Amino acid sequence: AVVRADTLGKPWAVAELKRTRETILKASAQDTTLRPFVLHHNWVVNTPMETGIADPDKARRALETARKFTNPFGVFVTGIDRDETAGQQEGSFEGSKVFSYTGAVMTLPTGVQAIAENNYGNPDQALGYLLRMSRSFSYAHPGSMYEVSPDYGMLVQAWNVYSFAVPVVHQFFGIDPMAARKEIRIRPQMPASWNQCSLENVRIGDNQISVHYEKTEDGTIKLTVLQDRGDWQILLQPGAEDPSLPKVLKGDAERTQEDGQWVLRCSGEQIQITYNLN
């Protein structure tokens, strides 16, 4: 790792790796204290936040650290390939003339990081990663992005769907289906800049739903859900501690409590509520 960093001309990484080596060599063989460390800062160290298994406090610190390993197009695959300006660039980038995975920024680790940010309640940061990826949208293939940003590797990559669909559908709009039970749980977690947005014709089993979100200047949120099958249950979780705060404008709704949170169990082809975030 030291040789790689030195060859690439990354003095910050060389210094960090040498400190890590000294710490390891000084440690006593009888000392069983856990001392986790990383060498290459590979993006896979962020998967505990992607899967949601990291403790919130540790996750917060790890997410802050990960933001330093970015360029205008997303997250570096191998963190020691970045330079001292990484995490600060917003409008400039100079790529290599010959393709190499060394120094690569890819849509997979960037999408993973967006999902991780959403898992810990940071939709604005998640949107930032999506916007970085979208800078290479349609560079070569209309409607698609390269495997490696901005224009290297495979020109079509399946994991791009994961990198965008999970943050937008499952996390921003909060759609969490359980088709076998004919239930769809919805709890939006929108970026602050998204005051009005819609996601239409999402097919779930033999049902199809559309979700419309609107936030007014006073912070009131109007959420409208349309579905083809009115006998399916829509479980809305507006995040209000007071169960009387969500106002049901359309549809049938029953207020219930699950795991200490209030849930509106709704039915009908059109459901509409208003509420304010805590």
What are these regions (language model features)?
Residues 1-178, 232:
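Active-site core of glycosidic bond-cleaving carbohydrate-active enzymes
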